[in-house]
Amino acid sequence: MSHSEAMKAVAVKAKEASRKIACADGTARNAAIIELAALLEQEKEFIFAENKKDLDAAKERGLDQARLQRLEITPSVLEYMIQGCNEVAGQADPVGEIEKMERRPNGMMVGKMRIPLGVIMMIFESRPNVTVDAAVLCLKAGNSVILRGGSEAIHSNLALASLLQKALGKADLPAEAVQVVEVTDREAVGELLKLDEYIDVVIPRGGEGLIRAVVSQATMPVLKHYKGVCHMYVDSDCEIPEAMDIIKNAKTQKPAACNSLECLLVHEDIAKEILPSLGVLLGACGVTMKGCPRAMPLLGPKAIAADFDDWGMEYLDLILCVKVVSTQDEAQDHISRYGSNHSEVILTKNHDRAMRFIREVDASMVGVNASTRFNDGGQLGLGAEIGISTSKLHSYGPMGATELTSTKFVLLGNWDVRN
């Protein structure tokens, strides 16, 4: 069977299953998710053994330590997956919810009902836990899912998918609602991205190169963010000790996260007061500071001059660009030019400036006096998330189960005809 035929067979199975899973009762979908949590605990030795196959092969191929860490399923990672299943199962069912039911002047009732998107394809790198996270959210929202993880995690992904399918079967739901692409070469992905007749949306998670490749080939809508170039603007009217704590958290808590701070903009009236201390604080944390000409003398002797390419760079590392600005206008113009619509924050005691920042800055999360690290489904009250979208269509920001649904109009008439 050719790649084209094999991938079409996968998509057809997912499409057929999507009709059944969409009509299934929410109780059955929750039962499958709870059963999966139990299976993850019961079959943990099997999971660890399959994951070890991937780790051993990755070490032989010379994968770097960061990618090996993302690939490994540790006991704590597995426990997090189990907790995520139970948390999602406990959430309200988004499917079938009717919103804004209103009576029209002609007496008819009109509203909107939440419905599944259909078939969602997830393309992701390295992290096998995404197999469970993505599938559980898709199932919660009544969707079927096609999972295409990185080739380096093939044994782990297949093991986890087998448990997902087993859990679906025990809940009397179609096992075909979860499909894993077993072919590891990239040609298979290209074939799937042509199948908009069967696949309703694709969500890529990984590096910017992967995401741009998916966008360039996909014939169906893509929910994505290319990168997280997150800014923080320190206003002249600011609590300096608290601001320094927030900046440290945003940069150093998890520098490889897409919601970590990459560029700090500081008002000139407060720069001399905050930047020398900040240079010492972040320097002690191993952060390399790259500054504009006005920031360089204030950041300490280890600071490096920023060049043009540094603005707009997603480092995902202990590197921070710092720019001194004269006005809030200049700060917001910089964000507009170099930002990626991900997470942007202002630190200020001035209410009017904060509200202006919220109104005018375009990002999936705009914050006041808080770390950029809060742009996360769990922190924003969504529970687990399938990813963060910086595409305003169909969703903007972290995507939980509700964001994996759409709406249809519901019309309740009384034997009405249109005049």
Swiss-Prot record:
It is found in: Cytoplasm. Pathway: Amino-acid biosynthesis; L-proline biosynthesis; L-glutamate 5-semialdehyde from L-glutamate: step 2/2. Pfam families: Aldedh. InterPro entries: Ald_DH/histidinol_DH (IPR016161), Ald_DH_C (IPR016163), Ald_DH_N (IPR016162), Aldehyde_DH_dom (IPR015590), Glu-5-SA_DH (IPR012134), GPR_dom (IPR000965). GO terms for molecular function: glutamate-5-semialdehyde dehydrogenase activity; NADP binding. GO terms for cellular component: cytoplasm. Keywords: Amino-acid biosynthesis, Cytoplasm, NADP, Oxidoreductase, Proline biosynthesis. Gene3D superfamilies: Aldehyde Dehydrogenase, Chain A, domain 1 (3.40.605.10), Aldehyde Dehydrogenase, Chain A, domain 2 (3.40.309.10). GO terms for biological process: L-proline biosynthetic process. It catalyses: L-glutamate 5-semialdehyde + phosphate + NADP(+) = L-glutamyl 5-phosphate + NADPH + H(+). Catalyzes the NADPH-dependent reduction of L-glutamate 5-phosphate into L-glutamate 5-semialdehyde and phosphate. The product spontaneously undergoes cyclization to form 1-pyrroline-5-carboxylate. Belongs to the gamma-glutamyl phosphate reductase family. This is Gamma-glutamyl phosphate reductase. It comes from Maridesulfovibrio salexigens (strain ATCC 14822 / DSM 2638 / NCIMB 8403 / VKM B-1763). The lineage of its organism: Bacteria, Pseudomonadati, Thermodesulfobacteriota, Desulfovibrionia, Desulfovibrionales. The gene is proA.
